[in-house]
């Protein structure tokens, strides 16, 4: 889209392009270092912030994603890494499903079938299987999401919109 304006000396019309909107913001060095810790191949990834959420993109597609994101309305692009809260990353549930997740970056809690169903229903889960802090919740070796243990309590970080409602 462009704006038409009259040229005073030529008597005709000239087109002035609209300024592009910038959707992607650079993440600072400390945040980028924390984000790199969460992926297996950080040299192949670049990171950007959209609003308060950080996203990861493969370097090979980064320019195309940026160009499309500035030209078209984008619903979702890249891997949602999460949001920074008091200097630490609060991981997005999509990061648990990312095939390039570095599983050594965070403690993993393996749950049996009954506990996994409780987790997916956002019900209380026993704190015994979890380490202090953020944990990757797994069942049969597959990542389900994240949970945070604080003392003898576990905060379920599974999205409320995805929870299992019926038994």
Which residue ranges define each predicted feature?
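Polybasic, low-complexity RNA-engagement segments
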Residues: 2-167
């Amino acid at each position: 889209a462009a704006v038409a304006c009259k040229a005073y000396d030529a008597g005709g019309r000239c087109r002035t392009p609209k300024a592009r909107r910038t959707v992607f913001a650079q993440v600072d060095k400390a945040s980028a270092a924390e984000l790199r810790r969460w992926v297996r191949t950080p040299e192949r990834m670049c990171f950007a912030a959209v609003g308060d959420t950080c996203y990861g993109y493969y370097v090979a597609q980064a320019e195309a994603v940026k160009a499309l994101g500035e030209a078209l309305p984008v619903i979702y692009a890249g891997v949602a890494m999460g949001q920074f809260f008091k200097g630490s990353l609060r991981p997005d549930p999509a990061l648990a499903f990312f095939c390039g997740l570095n599983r050594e970056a965070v403690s993993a809690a393996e749950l049996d079938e009954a506990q996994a169903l409780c987790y997916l229903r956002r019900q209380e889960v026993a704190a015994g299987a979890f380490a202090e802090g953020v944990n990757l919740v797994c069942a049969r070796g597959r990542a389900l999401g994240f949970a945070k243990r604080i003392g003898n309590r576990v905060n379920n970080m599974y999205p409320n919109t995805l929870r299992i409602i019926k038994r």
